[in-house]
């Protein structure tokens, strides 16, 4: 499947639970649909799913590029209860239902096109269609996407791999649950004064935090943070891991804690990039930054300095929506190919280059050693 494990979060496990605990509901259900599948059904009356999203369910096989027959059989789920699979960016055979068309005000010749899972659509919107280019999304979580032409599904590191928007292309996706959420927690817990100031000045509080972090020298006064407030996933999985501030002294101020939060996410990014390069035996030459964290120039600079790799900011901040639009444009004939559509994303990138090589090397090594030392204690 490309997934590191089969657990209770997966739709496959949830279907098994419904079958075993709500047998009457299971028996009466003709099709089980994900939310996106349901929207396609309501629009057209057709049961349809697309492959990138299906690859996140536990019932899709990356080896066969279709339903995982052995897994469905072992789970006792007949394929007939699932929708037909389509490529992302496919014009569905079924047309818009007349009542839907009337309610939404669409023309009779409006086409319905399958989209893609958020991370794969975002990678497309950022131009991430070739090996060596990586997207990182610092939202609530940190998601790192690397396009691959070949995926080692037996790799012992068990990094998540999804189907990409193109046949024969995969998206390896290391995932860390608290990145922007770490900063939000810090803001909510310790930055009441900054929140009041931002409200009075009609500014985003995150702009104020960026300014405070930028005024604080690299290294955060020797303070290190581990950003694992809800557990770690990659490169070392430990659901019991928790956040840590290490190295507090009498001269440690609020701005040092804040800077350590920014730097810890950059360290986490570098650690997972090194995992990607180790697993795939290929260099990473550029990082394209997405999500709310991409708006922070100081955070992009810290990431570039920590990793030693240029970090790019797309002119179009909503890369996921742009990727979905690219799929529709190719499907409707507006663009000849996804590669052609993605060229626009290539041109519209502002780059932040590494400055001060080696500035963070000692701190990064201490960060890695700190987690290795504390991991057995969580």
Spans of features found by a protein language model:
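A polyampholytic, Gly/Pro-enriched intrinsically disordered region
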Residues: 1-9, 103-107, 132-135, 330-344
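Gly/Ser/Thr-rich active-site cleft segment
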Residues: 2-117, 183, 226-230, 258, ...
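Glycine/Thr-rich phosphate-binding loops that ligate phosphate moieties of nucleotide
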Residues: 23-29, 46, 66, 146-378
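ATP-dependent carbohydrate kinase catalytic cores
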Residues: 59-167, 178, 194, 200-214, ...
């Amino acid at each position: 499947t490309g997934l590191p494990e089969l657990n209770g979060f997966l739709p496959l496990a949830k279907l098994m639970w419904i079958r075993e605990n709500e047998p009457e509901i299971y028996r009466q259900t003709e099709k089980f649909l994900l939310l996106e599948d349901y929207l396609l059904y309501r629009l057209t009356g057709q049961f349809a799913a697309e492959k990138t999203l299906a690859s996140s369910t536990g019932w899709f096989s990356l080896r066969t590029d279709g339903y995982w027959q052995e897994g469905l059989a072992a789970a006792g789920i007949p394929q007939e209860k699932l929708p037909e699979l389509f490529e992302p960016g496919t014009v569905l055979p079924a047309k818009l239902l007349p009542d839907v068309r009337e309610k939404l005000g669409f023309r009779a010749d409006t086409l319905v096109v399958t989209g893609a899972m958020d991370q794969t659509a975002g990678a497309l919107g950022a131009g991430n269609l070739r090996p060596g280019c990586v997207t990182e999304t610092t939202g609530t979580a940190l998601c790192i996407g690397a396009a691959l032409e070949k995926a080692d599904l037996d790799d012992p590191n068990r990094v998540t791999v999804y189907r990409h928007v193109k046949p024969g292309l995969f998206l390896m996706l290391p995932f860390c649950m608290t990145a922007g959420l770490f900063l939000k927690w810090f803001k909510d817990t310790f930055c009441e004064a900054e929140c009041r100031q931002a409200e009075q000045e009609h500014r985003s509080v995150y702009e104020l935090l960026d300014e405070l972090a930028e005024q604080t020298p690299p290294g955060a006064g020797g303070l290190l943070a581990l950003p694992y407030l809800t557990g770690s996933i990659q490169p070392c999985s430990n659901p019991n891991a928790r956040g840590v501030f290490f190295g507090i002294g009498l001269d440690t101020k609020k701005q040092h804690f804040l800077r350590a939060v920014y730097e810890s996410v950059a360290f986490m990014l570098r650690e997972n990039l090194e995992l990607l390069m180790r697993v795939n035996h290929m260099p990473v030459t550029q990082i394209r930054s997405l999500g709310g964290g991409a708006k922070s120039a100081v955070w992009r600079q810290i990431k570039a300095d920590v990793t030693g790799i240029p970090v790019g900011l797309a002119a179009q901040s909503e890369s996921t929506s742009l990727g979905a639009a690219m799929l529709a444009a190719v499907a409707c004939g507006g663009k000849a190919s996804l590669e052609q559509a993605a060229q626009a994303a290539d041109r519209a990138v502002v780059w932040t280059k590494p400055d001060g090589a080696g500035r963070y090397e000692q701190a990064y090594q201490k960060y890695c050693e700190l987690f290795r030392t504390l991991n057995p204690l969580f």
